[in-house]
Swiss-Prot record:
Family from the record: Belongs to the bacterial ribosomal protein bL28 family.
Native species: Azoarcus sp. (strain BH72)
Gene Ontology terms for molecular function: structural constituent of ribosome
Protein name: Large ribosomal subunit protein bL28
Higher taxonomy: Bacteria, Pseudomonadati, Pseudomonadota, Betaproteobacteria, Rhodocyclales
GO cellular-component term (any): cytosolic large ribosomal subunit
Length: 78
């Protein structure tokens, strides 16, 4: 799946457009994904990730090395 955050797993959701007349049509809510690269002190290299804005906040809080270790523990290739 293309529009999925590599850290949080956030993916598109399905909902409704609701007009002023209360007509409903299907729409997709897309996650706010950003292609970012992070400097890893432990590996002494740049790590590229496609992450949501919520994941950026998580990386700021925990640190990129901790987040990458968690990704590798669950089997993702980084």
């Amino acid at each position: 799946m293309a529009r999925v955050c590599q850290v949080t797993g956030k993916a598109p959701m399905v909902g409704n457009h609701v007009s002023h007349a209360n007509n409903k049509t299907k729409r997709r809510f897309l996650p706010n994904l950003q292609n970012r690269r992070f400097w890893s002190e432990a590996e002494n290299r740049w790590i590229r990730l496609r992450v949501s804005n919520a994941a950026l906040r998580t990386i700021d809080k925990k640190g990129i090395d901790v987040v990458v270790a968690e990704l590798r523990a669950r089997g993702d290739k980084i």
